[in-house]
Amino acid sequence: MAQFFKAKPNSSKQLSAKLSLSVNQLDHLGAGIAQHQGKVVFIPGALPDETVTVQLTEQKKNYARAKLIKVDTPSSERVEPECPHYHTCGGCDLQHMSLSGQREHKEAALLDIMAKFAGAEGGALSPALTGEGWHYRRRARLATLFDKNTKHLSLGFRAASSSNVVPISQCQVLAKPLSDLIVPFAKLLNQLSAKASLGHLELIAADNGHFAVLRITKALNDKDLAKLSAFAEQHQIHICLQDNEGQFQGVGAELVLPVYQLLDDKAESDAVSLSFTPGNFVQVNGQINKAMVAQAMDWLAPAPDERILDLFCGMGNFSLPLAKMGADVIGVEGVAEMVTQARVNAKANNLDKLTFYHGDLSADLSLEPWMGKIDKLLLDPARAGAFESLQWLKKMKPRKVVYVSCNPASLARDSAVLLERGYRLQQLGLIDMFPQTHHIEAMALFELTK
């Protein structure tokens, strides 16, 4: 019999009564769904086919929310969370469900959203892109909190829906070498005279080593720098400091940039690497990112001299491999710093059939120098999606569109636009980028039919 104790969420009305409810399904955010007095009740932590004791925390006209008090009849999918911080840390929210159950739920949720909001029921369901369920994150940002009374600095993750920092000793989804650095780093930071002026700590596992980025709000003195330098040497890690202006400075050595390989099992002549500054966005799951890039290459099937447009291209995660396969690639990104790094990456990989542009992809694109007829289109937008960019489909007329999504809701909305413009959904597949969480990512292939 599992017991759960979590901080009370913000609510419009607190009710003290405890109820016994039967859970029939999960919502798209991973919360259990039950019925009570004609209302849908959302219960984080509950699973389908469970009988649970809950306490209502919020009541609206058509739904209610409840806190899970006790699992009376557990689901066959319920498992014991591996992380000792699971019930307080806000990082993971599905560790109580088997990995196979998580993936089955995510795939069903993806199909449901696409059918309900896009009317997209056609197309072949591609096998889900899956990898390791634990220690898969190659990057994580830990928060710090300095207690003025005890003079102690806590290092950990934010609690769910809170600014409170939960001190942690390990992270079961973080790469093991990075997880093993959490306790030593917490001890080190508490030895610094500037510990009250420290911000977050970012840990990165790259193909060329391990990295730590420490946010500082004022310059460190020589003694603190010496301690950081000694720690870096002892643990064989690159440490750099990020100041208030966003500038980076290496500790004890020149600043080294992390590097990732984008494709697996490639000869050195076919390898594609991506370097980045610590402030840039990169996919945190390296194993899945490689599988995702490979699947995008397979679905787009770039041919030499085809004109392929990569919108929301970042630093070249897809653009670089596309150009390596001989296509004429145009990458467009809204963050200027990432465009600069993308150009650096193109040069480092000796790719000359690749041009990057900086631009606002939610604005009028009609006069952009890259706008015009293309053969194929790749989209990898943020959670807001690519709705504005898709309004220019008629001018671009790509035969194929591969859409990589981190938000099924915006994917469904944008898919409706593609279907209205004469495209057919040919492939749809789950990308399990974040095991142990409710987050759903997906890839879809559309082909022009008229």
Curated annotation (Swiss-Prot):
Protein encoded by which gene: rlmD
Matches recorded under InterPro entries: 23S_rRNA_MeTrfase_RlmD, MeTrfase_TrmA_AS, MeTrfase_TrmA_CS, NA-bd_OB-fold, SAM-dependent_MTases_sf, TRAM_dom, U5_MeTrfase_fam
GO molecular function terms attached to this record: 4 iron, 4 sulfur cluster binding; iron ion binding; RNA binding; rRNA (uridine-C5-)-methyltransferase activity
UniProt keyword Membrane present: no
Keywords, comma-separated and alphabetical: 4Fe-4S, Iron, Iron-sulfur, Metal-binding, Methyltransferase, rRNA processing, S-adenosyl-L-methionine, Transferase
Ion transport in keyword set: no
Protein name: 23S rRNA (uracil(1939)-C(5))-methyltransferase RlmD
PROSITE patterns reported in the protein's UniProt record: SAM_MT_RNA_M5U, TRAM, TRMA_1, TRMA_2
